[in-house]
A protein has these predicted regions:
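Active-site recognition of the HExxH zinc-binding catalytic motif
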Residues: 136-149, 168
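Auxiliary, metal-adjacent structural segments of Zn-dependent hydrolase domains
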Residues: 59-116
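Inter-helical turn/loop segments and adjacent helix faces that build the functional surface
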Residues: 149-157, 176-182, 239-244
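N-terminal low-structure segments adjacent to metalloprotease catalytic domains
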Residues: 1-69
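Hydrophobic (often cysteine-bearing) scaffold residues that line and stabilize catalytic clefts
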Residues: 135, 159, 163, 225
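Post-HExxH zinc-binding segment in Zn-dependent metallohydrolases
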Residues: 2-9, 157-197
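Short pre-active-site segment immediately N-terminal to the catalytic Zn-binding motif
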Residues: 122-137, 158
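Pan-zinc metallopeptidase signature
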Residues: 29-30, 200-264
Length: 264
């Protein structure tokens, strides 16, 4: 395991035995007084997360070269850019990812919030665009972990639309590059219609309803919630040109949503 000022790089050679492999990786994560086990209160909870984020017995890339030096360099450089906008330094735990979905659908990099100020990043360096995807994911998750309101287990669909929209716009602004795959699903003209479809679920905390709206299902295309959030917040930022990133990230998402709904 490699670490440097809140950046923890965890690596382990792939094993066919799922339980053994996950226990090996979680065994490399020490308990810390403020954040526990990478943001989780127990190793068991961390293991549950890593089982689907890291392990994939059908992965074609069980022996890819996890370039720790390059990964760390990208993480440090990207975080430096984020901190220029919002000076709240997070803990970052980086793991290799053997997930086929992460490689094929997410550019080789996935990430999630585990606790306020703690993010987990999962990297497959055999994916073609993994380096840029790593930058995108870091910027996106940075917004989530420094927000005083973000909690994926408690947030409503409406709050989540706002959070994902802020994260996507922040990422685009910081990297000054292309739009992410998540933001391209919808066009601006689609926003009103999609919002009407989901408005009766706007206060829902039901995880299945969240999954259908953000990750796709019969009614919605994959990444619909992300794309809707991106477009709505893009419009909101144009209208509120003087609002800075610190202000919008620390603003109650329900107040933002209320303002957005008036303009739809």
């Amino acid at each position: 395991m490699s670490k440097e000022k809140g950046i923890f790089l965890i690596d382990a050679v792939y094993e066919k035995n799922k339980e053994s492999f996950i226990k090996k990786i979680t065994g490399l994560v020490k308990k810390r007084r403020i954040i526990g086990y990478a943001g989780y209160s127990s190793r068991k909870d961390l293991e549950k997360n890593l089982l689907w984020q890291v392990f994939d017995e059908n992965s074609p890339d069980k022996n890819f070269d996890f370039d720790k030096k390059k990964v760390k360099k990208i993480v440090k450089e990207t975080l430096r850019k984020c901190l220029k906008e919002v000076n709240e330094k997070p803990y970052v735990f980086i793991f290799p990812s053997y997930s086929t979905f992460t490689k094929l659908k997410m550019g080789g990099v996935g990430g999630n919030f585990s606790k306020h100020n703690v993010m987990l990043i999962f990297v497959n360096t055999s994916a073609k665009m993994w380096e840029y995807s790593l930058k995108e994911t870091l910027c996106h998750e940075f917004v989530h972990v420094v927000s005083p309101y973000y909690n994926p287990w408690e947030n409503t669909i409406g709050e989540r639309i706002v959070f994902e929209g802020i994260a996507e716009n922040f990422q685009e602004n910081v990297l000054k590059g292309r739009r992410s795959i998540f933001s391209k699903i919808l066009k601006e003209k689609d926003c009103k219609e999609i919002f009407k479809k989901v408005v009766n679920k706007i206060n829902s905390k039901n995880s299945k309803e969240h999954d259908r709206f953000f990750y796709g299902g019969k009614k919605y295309k994959r990444w619909t919630g992300y794309s809707l959030g991106y477009l709505l917040i893009k419009k909101y930022l144009k209208k509120n040109k003087n609002i800075g990133w610190i202000s919008i990230i620390h603003k109650n998402p329900n107040k933002i949503l209320e303002e957005i709904r008036k303009d739809l």
